[in-house]
């Protein structure tokens, strides 16, 4: 192994074990590169332990990467480390990006509750949108695990039935496979992300790839990933008016041309590969002339391209 690059997978690893790993790498002169995807763990209401793990990893890293300038500022504030900012690449297979979408007479506005993990609270969002849903169809999906989630104490099954009676297209199913996710995204036009906290989301990128307009909360840094409508939602509650305005904008908005999106994603993917190669080479102490602050990313503190 020449470089260890950590993205995920350390959620259950005690900080003292991470310190041992960092010391082992340092002893063998193997650089550690860390990409900070989540400053808050979306699966737990309290991210104290997650932050402690990040503190160990970020402190030991030869290079730190994150996905948005706002997250980079947080990393610098918390741990005094500057980050290379590289955007999240495409999520859907590149050959499927930009596929033609059939216009619907009645657009579908969707909410996905997933397994009702800690940062997801779809109920206030649904309650706010139900009175407005006459001009479009409202769909709610949930993974089967949601029925056994801690939030199920709030009578999830009864809630779902009430929404069905109110006209919501409610679907409970196994967690999506890759193919099922692509099919789902082809069936919806707008996807509201019901996150009360968090940092970044692959769903934002999947929506962009599929030509779906995401509506994202103003918590975390979801709004920096793509130019999607934003509403106010966080640990302190929901601004229902801002949600309804954002959904109205999303339903009426134009989508970028599919061919243009695929071309941009191909170019971005190659650029990110080049940047990561440069980061690895710099971590290893070898020369590299690729530069870091052009195109899609920059070192924190330098101006991002318009």
Q: Where do the model's predicted regions map?
A:
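A charged, aromatic-enriched C-terminal amphipathic alpha-helix characteristic of glycosyltransferases
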Residues: 237-289, 296-298
